[in-house]
């Protein structure tokens, strides 16, 4: 499918950024999740066009004029990020939703 190839291309660009550019920038991201993880999760959870819109919107917020904070991809929760053994952006199966422990 053409869309999945394009989505894979954009995921590859994000991984390239993480590997080749991000280590040299120094300052940590102001947001949780980081902008690169946000991009990977958006590409995983939403259609390509919506993902690109969400990523662009997030990157426009990234700068010294913004305080930062928690800014999750729509249709995700903090619990999903915190309970996942691997980052949501890296999980092998899109259908896998991390479970949360229930207290009795």
From Swiss-Prot:
<dbReference type="InterPro" id="IPR002696">
    <property type="entry name" value="Membr_insert_effic_factor_YidD"/>
</dbReference>
<feature type="region of interest" description="Disordered">
    <location>
        <begin position="83"/>
        <end position="104"/>
    </location>
</feature>
<dbReference type="GO" id="GO:0005886">
    <property type="term" value="C:plasma membrane"/>
</dbReference>
<keyword id="KW-0997">Cell inner membrane</keyword>
<keyword id="KW-0472">Membrane</keyword>
<comment type="similarity">
    <text>Belongs to the UPF0161 family.</text>
</comment>
<dbReference type="Pfam" id="PF01809">
    <property type="entry name" value="YidD"/>
</dbReference>
<comment type="function">
    <text>Could be involved in insertion of integral membrane proteins into the membrane.</text>
</comment>
<keyword id="KW-1003">Cell membrane</keyword>
<protein>
    <recommendedName>
        <fullName>Putative membrane protein insertion efficiency factor</fullName>
    </recommendedName>
</protein>
